[in-house]
Amino acid sequence: MLTITDSLELANGLRPLLLQLNRHLRRELAGLGITAGQAALLHVIRTHPDIGLRALAEHEGVSAPAMSGYIDRLEAAGFVARVRSAEDRRRVGLRVTGDGVRVLRSARSRRTAWLAQRMRRLSDAERAAVAAALEPLALLLAEEPA
Protein backbone atom coordinates (compact mmCIF):
# COMPACT_ATOMS: atom_id res chain seq x y z
CA MET A 1 0.00 0.00 0.00
CA LEU A 2 1.18 3.49 -0.85
CA THR A 3 2.23 5.51 2.20
CA ILE A 4 3.35 8.77 0.67
CA THR A 5 3.33 11.57 3.21
CA ASP A 6 5.45 14.07 1.32
CA SER A 7 3.07 16.61 -0.23
CA LEU A 8 5.08 16.99 -3.44
CA GLU A 9 5.31 13.23 -4.05
CA LEU A 10 1.62 12.81 -3.30
CA ALA A 11 0.72 15.68 -5.66
CA ASN A 12 2.88 14.15 -8.40
CA GLY A 13 1.08 10.83 -7.97
CA LEU A 14 -2.42 12.30 -7.79
CA ARG A 15 -2.20 14.84 -10.62
CA PRO A 16 -1.89 12.39 -13.55
CA LEU A 17 -4.66 10.22 -12.11
CA LEU A 18 -7.00 13.19 -11.87
CA LEU A 19 -6.15 14.26 -15.42
CA GLN A 20 -6.85 10.78 -16.73
CA LEU A 21 -10.11 10.56 -14.76
CA ASN A 22 -11.18 13.93 -16.15
CA ARG A 23 -10.38 12.78 -19.69
CA HIS A 24 -12.54 9.66 -19.27
CA LEU A 25 -15.44 11.66 -17.81
CA ARG A 26 -15.25 14.13 -20.72
CA ARG A 27 -15.52 11.23 -23.18
CA GLU A 28 -18.81 10.23 -21.58
CA LEU A 29 -20.33 13.42 -23.03
CA ALA A 30 -19.82 12.20 -26.60
CA GLY A 31 -23.07 12.23 -28.51
CA LEU A 32 -24.84 14.63 -26.15
CA GLY A 33 -23.97 17.70 -28.23
CA ILE A 34 -22.24 19.40 -25.31
CA THR A 35 -18.68 19.86 -24.14
CA ALA A 36 -17.48 19.48 -20.55
CA GLY A 37 -17.03 23.25 -20.35
CA GLN A 38 -20.57 23.84 -21.54
CA ALA A 39 -21.89 21.30 -19.03
CA ALA A 40 -20.02 23.13 -16.28
CA LEU A 41 -21.55 26.46 -17.33
CA LEU A 42 -25.03 24.93 -17.43
CA HIS A 43 -24.49 23.60 -13.92
CA VAL A 44 -23.50 27.05 -12.63
CA ILE A 45 -26.48 28.70 -14.33
CA ARG A 46 -28.82 26.03 -12.98
CA THR A 47 -27.55 26.52 -9.43
CA HIS A 48 -27.66 30.34 -9.82
CA PRO A 49 -30.87 30.99 -11.78
CA ASP A 50 -31.10 34.45 -13.34
CA ILE A 51 -27.36 35.04 -12.95
CA GLY A 52 -26.19 37.86 -15.19
CA LEU A 53 -23.62 37.40 -17.91
CA ARG A 54 -21.06 39.61 -16.17
CA ALA A 55 -21.50 37.79 -12.84
CA LEU A 56 -21.14 34.45 -14.60
CA ALA A 57 -17.98 35.65 -16.34
CA GLU A 58 -16.52 36.76 -13.00
CA HIS A 59 -17.50 33.46 -11.39
CA GLU A 60 -15.71 31.54 -14.14
CA GLY A 61 -12.73 33.89 -14.37
CA VAL A 62 -13.19 34.89 -18.01
CA SER A 63 -13.98 38.14 -19.77
CA ALA A 64 -17.58 39.20 -20.35
CA PRO A 65 -17.13 39.15 -24.17
CA ALA A 66 -15.75 35.60 -24.03
CA MET A 67 -18.62 34.49 -21.79
CA SER A 68 -21.09 36.14 -24.17
CA GLY A 69 -19.78 33.90 -26.95
CA TYR A 70 -20.11 30.79 -24.77
CA ILE A 71 -23.68 31.74 -23.86
CA ASP A 72 -24.54 32.52 -27.50
CA ARG A 73 -23.58 28.94 -28.40
CA LEU A 74 -25.57 27.46 -25.51
CA GLU A 75 -28.55 29.62 -26.45
CA ALA A 76 -28.31 28.57 -30.12
CA ALA A 77 -28.30 24.93 -29.00
CA GLY A 78 -31.46 25.57 -26.98
CA PHE A 79 -29.85 24.89 -23.60
CA VAL A 80 -29.96 28.44 -22.15
CA ALA A 81 -32.45 31.29 -22.32
CA ARG A 82 -31.86 34.97 -21.63
CA VAL A 83 -34.69 36.30 -19.46
CA ARG A 84 -35.46 39.97 -18.76
CA SER A 85 -35.95 40.84 -15.10
CA ALA A 86 -39.52 41.79 -14.19
CA GLU A 87 -38.19 44.33 -11.67
CA ASP A 88 -35.55 45.93 -13.90
CA ARG A 89 -36.17 45.54 -17.63
CA ARG A 90 -32.55 46.51 -18.35
CA ARG A 91 -31.27 43.44 -16.50
CA VAL A 92 -31.08 40.12 -18.34
CA GLY A 93 -30.56 36.89 -16.44
CA LEU A 94 -29.73 33.41 -17.65
CA ARG A 95 -31.75 30.26 -17.12
CA VAL A 96 -31.28 26.66 -18.17
CA THR A 97 -34.05 25.50 -20.51
CA GLY A 98 -35.83 22.15 -20.36
CA ASP A 99 -33.45 20.81 -23.02
CA GLY A 100 -30.53 22.10 -20.97
CA VAL A 101 -31.79 20.32 -17.86
CA ARG A 102 -32.22 17.10 -19.86
CA VAL A 103 -28.70 17.25 -21.28
CA LEU A 104 -27.28 17.96 -17.81
CA ARG A 105 -29.14 14.95 -16.39
CA SER A 106 -27.88 12.77 -19.23
CA ALA A 107 -24.32 13.98 -18.68
CA ARG A 108 -24.51 13.27 -14.95
CA SER A 109 -26.11 9.88 -15.55
CA ARG A 110 -23.48 8.80 -18.09
CA ARG A 111 -20.59 9.96 -15.92
CA THR A 112 -22.01 8.34 -12.80
CA ALA A 113 -22.65 5.06 -14.65
CA TRP A 114 -19.06 5.04 -15.94
CA LEU A 115 -17.68 5.62 -12.44
CA ALA A 116 -19.99 3.04 -10.87
CA GLN A 117 -18.97 0.46 -13.46
CA ARG A 118 -15.31 1.11 -12.62
CA MET A 119 -16.01 0.98 -8.87
CA ARG A 120 -17.57 -2.49 -9.25
CA ARG A 121 -14.16 -3.76 -10.37
CA LEU A 122 -12.66 -2.84 -7.00
CA SER A 123 -12.64 -5.01 -3.91
CA ASP A 124 -14.67 -3.98 -0.85
CA ALA A 125 -11.46 -2.79 0.81
CA GLU A 126 -10.48 -0.73 -2.23
CA ARG A 127 -13.94 0.88 -2.39
CA ALA A 128 -13.65 1.65 1.33
CA ALA A 129 -10.29 3.33 0.67
CA VAL A 130 -11.85 5.44 -2.10
CA ALA A 131 -14.72 6.36 0.24
CA ALA A 132 -12.24 7.33 2.96
CA ALA A 133 -10.40 9.59 0.49
CA LEU A 134 -13.51 11.56 -0.53
CA GLU A 135 -13.51 13.97 2.40
CA PRO A 136 -9.78 14.80 2.25
CA LEU A 137 -10.06 15.28 -1.53
CA ALA A 138 -12.99 17.65 -1.01
CA LEU A 139 -10.82 19.66 1.38
CA LEU A 140 -8.32 20.17 -1.45
CA LEU A 141 -11.02 22.06 -3.34
CA ALA A 142 -12.19 24.15 -0.40
CA GLU A 143 -11.66 27.87 -0.77
CA GLU A 144 -8.93 29.30 1.39
CA PRO A 145 -10.08 31.96 3.86
CA ALA A 146 -9.46 35.51 2.65
Spans of model-derived segments:
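N-terminal helix-turn-helix DNA-binding core of bacterial DNA-binding proteins
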Residues: R23-A66, A77-F79
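N-terminal leader segment of winged-helix/HTH proteins
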Residues: M1-A36, L141
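Helical hydrophobic small-molecule/effector-binding pocket
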Residues: E28-G31, V101-S106, L139
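Charged, amphipathic alpha-helical coiled-coil/dimerization segments
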Residues: D50, D72-E135
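Short, charged, intrinsically disordered terminal tails
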Residues: L139-A146
